[in-house]
């Protein structure tokens, strides 16, 4: 494994551990010791997707899990994962899961709640 691949694996692990807070590419690059542009190029090269897309998709998967497994309000879930507003969260969630968060919850909510 090359040093660049190791760096990306370390960054992915750090991102996954910090998805509950706002993550800006600039901050991740600073944490990694790379420029924003260089880190984005490396990430795309080794992961086959953009850094921003990776973060957004991971946050959406966690939000979907929370919708299925909790009774928390959609607004609280959207804030937890750093979305700018509930409207933005709903638009991105709907584009990804083909239904708004409320409908997704109704259809997929765990039977234990």
Swiss-Prot record:
Provide the transmembrane region boundaries: none
Could you tell me which Gene3D superfamilies the record lists for this protein? Homeodomain-like
SUPFAM superfamilies noted in UniProt:
Homeodomain-like
Keywords of this entry: Activator, DNA-binding, Transcription, Transcription regulation
Where does the HTH araC/xylS-type domain start and stop, copy by copy?
9-107
What this chain does, per the entry, is described as: Probable transcriptional activator.
This one is known as Transcriptional activator RamA
Question: Mind giving the lineage of the organism this protein is from?
Answer: Bacteria, Pseudomonadati, Pseudomonadota, Gammaproteobacteria, Enterobacterales
């Amino acid at each position: 494994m090359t040093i660049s691949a190791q760096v990306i694996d370390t960054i992915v692990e750090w991102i996954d551990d910090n998805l509950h807070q706002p993550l800006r590419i600039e901050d991740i690059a600073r944490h990694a010791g790379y420029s924003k542009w260089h880190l984005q190029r490396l990430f795309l090269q080794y992961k086959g997707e953009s850094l921003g897309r990776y973060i957004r998709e991971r946050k959406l998967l966690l939000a979907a899990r929370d919708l299925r497994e909790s009774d928390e309000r959609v607004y609280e879930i959207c804030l937890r994962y750093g979305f700018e507003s509930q409207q933005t969260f709903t638009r991105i969630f709907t584009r990804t899961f083909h239904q708004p968060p409320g409908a997704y919850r109704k259809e997929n909510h765990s039977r234990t709640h």
